[in-house]
Design a protein with these regions (language model features):
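Helix-to-beta-strand junctions that scaffold the AdoMet/dcAdoMet cofactor pocket
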Residues: 143
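Class I (Rossmann-like) S-adenosyl-L-methionine-dependent methyltransferase catalytic domain
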Residues: 2-131, 146-241
Length: 241
């Protein structure tokens, strides 16, 4: 059976924060600027949300919209982060809805962008709104395996048929389980989800070294359900060993 290692993550939240619910953990990250420190104040959501970092991804997303979203469509962006880059990717035929688990972040967003439809939203527990696409960028690698499974299963109970989800390319990597709120590299096509390769990848980050490359997979709801069922079966087998 593939190895799973418990790991604090690439940064460690204080014990008193880890004792709190997930929404309070992400409130702590936002209000203390933990992810924003590296951006020189550009984005409270971290380096991955700067305009420079997202240049390639914004190009890829624009191509996706032009090819596959020719009519009016609703784009549910959860987590939406601080909206630093996404507003530059809005389309005339798009209805944008943003959700984020941090109430503090949502409050700040609403003050800055009162014209945008925003609300607090936990992808693992809250009912998804009516939409055509769920956009889940740079999120799941911050969650424990159990919370990832909850979020993916929760999505499959929605009416949204297409999910855009960030993924690392990590062939033969050991699976790391972290406390929600930390970070590790995550390949959803590996154990324990084994998502099928999607029909389309949107390139996100391609480092010079070629290691830890990122892309967003365009998966169908049925493909995500396949991954959820894999997790349930394989995790049950692990518990019995």
């Amino acid at each position: 059976m593939p190895q799973v290692i418990k790991f604090d993550g690439h940064y460690k939240l204080p014990a008193q924060v880890l004792d709190q619910a997930n929404d309070k953990r992400f409130d702590h990250i936002f209000t203390n600027g933990i992810w924003g420190r590296s951006t020189g104040g550009e984005s409270m959501s971290g380096t991955g949300s700067t305009m420079a970092y997202t240049e390639l991804y914004r190009q890829q997303l624009s191509l996706f919209f032009n090819e596959y979203c020719t009519g009016n469509f609703t784009f549910f962006d959860a987590p939406c982060g601080d909206l630093n880059w996404i507003t530059s990717s809005f389309q005339e035929n798009m209805r944008y809805i943003g959700g984020d688990i941090s109430s503090e972040l949502i409050r700040a967003n609403q003050q800055k962008h009162p014209e945008i439809e925003l609300f607090q939203f936990d992808i693992a527990t809250d009912d998804f709104p009516q939409a055509d696409i769920w956009h889940c960028r740079h999120c799941l690698f911050h969650l424990s395996l159990a919370d990832i499974a909850m979020a993916l299963e929760n999505y499959t109970n929605s009416n949204i048929n297409v999910a855009l989800i960030t993924n690392h390319f990590l062939p033969d990597a050991v699976t790391l389980d972290i406390p929600t709120g930390s970070f590790r590299h995550l390949d959803l096509t590996n154990y324990p989800f084994y998502l099928p390769n999607p029909k389309l990848w949107l390139l996100d980050y391609n480092p010079v070294s070629g290691k830890n490359a990122l892309a967003t997979g365009v998966w169908t709801k049925d493909e995500i359900l396949h991954g959820v069922n894999n997790y349930k079966r394989l995790w049950s087998q692990r518990a019995q060993t």
